[in-house]
């Protein structure tokens, strides 16, 4: 078996185990997202890429969504929701973003790999993705690969829940797609 195939199998199996997550927290996340006046999303590095993909889908759902750090992003205010994606939950800018959001009266949804992190403690809603430390992880899924893959899949599941809650369809989302596919 090739290393690529072995790595892919390992990643898929690991992510499936990691996503045996609590459905209650997902429902809380959906309520927070659909109730927010505006949704602001933040993450750094590969977690930031996952966050951007999530922000894109929320925009396609018709939600007023922004990525924190862009020059055209408005300020976060009370009634908004800040979604922060961070594996460690201790990235300084992620924790600061959550604390500032709370200070101005916005809600915070944290997607973290560490349920006991500073970011998780600063959040109103926590989607915790726990990773089992396996010997093969370093060889087949280095650094934060498993968290990033799992968080992307989990957030795509949240998108499906928000879609249902808002009565959206793929067709209505397509009409908001940047490329108008």
Which residues does each PLM region occupy?
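Internal, active-site/partner-interface "lid" segment
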Residues: 118-121, 135-139, 163-181
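Short, flexible segments with low predicted structural confidence
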Residues: 3-5, 29-30, 72-74, 130
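A short, well-structured juxtamembrane/interface segment
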Residues: 18-35
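Glycine-rich phosphate-binding loops that contact phosphosugars or nucleotide phosphates
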Residues: 38-153, 159-160
């Amino acid at each position: 078996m090739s290393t690529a195939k072995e790595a892919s199998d390992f990643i898929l199996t690991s992510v499936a185990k990691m996503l045996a997550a609590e459905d209650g927290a997902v429902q809380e996340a959906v309520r927070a997202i659909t109730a927010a006046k505006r949704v602001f999303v933040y993450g750094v590095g590969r977690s930031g890429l996952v966050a951007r993909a999530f922000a894109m889908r929320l925009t396609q759902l018709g939600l007023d969504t922004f990525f924190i750090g862009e020059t055209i992003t408005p300020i976060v205010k009370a009634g908004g929701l800040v979604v922060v994606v961070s594996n460690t939950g201790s990235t300084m800018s992620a924790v600061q973003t959550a604390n500032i959001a709370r200070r101005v009266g916005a809600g915070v949804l944290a997607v973290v790999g560490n349920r006991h992190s500073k970011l998780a403690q600063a959040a109103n809603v926590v989607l915790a993705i726990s990773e089992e430390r396996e010997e093969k992880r370093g060889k087949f899924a280095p650094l934060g690969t498993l968290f990033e893959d799992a968080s992307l899949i989990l957030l795509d599941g949240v998108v499906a829940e928000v879609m249902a809650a808002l009565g959206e369809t793929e067709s209505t989302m397509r009409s908001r797609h940047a490329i108008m596919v």
